């Protein structure tokens, strides 16, 4: 994902609708966020500092993205599951891009849509996770970070 080129891009989607894009310049370590003309005409900013006119600074975008990440052990589990560094904010956001708070997703351009799949959780598996969270964290299911499942805190919803 971050293999030598300077600019990296994620699409912002609300359902199936493309509403904008996030760009990261790895040489300058800066972010840019822009909305599609259609979204600018009838949508709303993702956050008050992320204005529809695209004037948000890299620091404002970085702060917004950082707030999408879990804290403490949740972040540690995410970093471990994705095998990326704590400072690689772009890779972290891409890694949880389909599972961030809210309805907007962050995906690579032309990344295929993966339908949501549900699976039953047995009482035994749930008990194991509650009794041994250091081995079976609530934030990782089936080898993937699942942040919205646990509310990114060591609790069950």
Where does each model-flagged region fall?
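Phosphate/dinucleotide-binding and metal-coordinating scaffold of catalytic cores
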Residues: 1-157
């Amino acid at each position: 994902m971050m293999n030598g080129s300077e600019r990296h891009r994620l699409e912002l989607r609300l359902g199936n609708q493309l509403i904008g894009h996030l760009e990261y310049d790895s040489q300058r370590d800066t972010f840019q966020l822009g909305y599609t003309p259609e979204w600018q005409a009838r949508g709303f900013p993702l956050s008050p500092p992320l204005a529809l006119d695209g004037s948000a600074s890299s620091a404002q975008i970085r702060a917004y993205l950082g707030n999408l990440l879990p804290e403490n052990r949740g972040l540690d589990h995410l970093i471990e599951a994705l095998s990326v560094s704590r400072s690689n904010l772009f890779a972290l956001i891409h890694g949880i891009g389909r599972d961030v708070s809210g309805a907007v997703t962050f995906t690579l351009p032309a990344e295929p849509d993966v339908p949501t799949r549900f699976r039953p959780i047995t009482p035994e598996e749930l008990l194991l996770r509650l009794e041994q969270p250091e081995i079976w964290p609530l934030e990782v299911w089936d080898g993937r970070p699942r942040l919205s499942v646990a509310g990114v805190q060591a609790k069950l919803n």
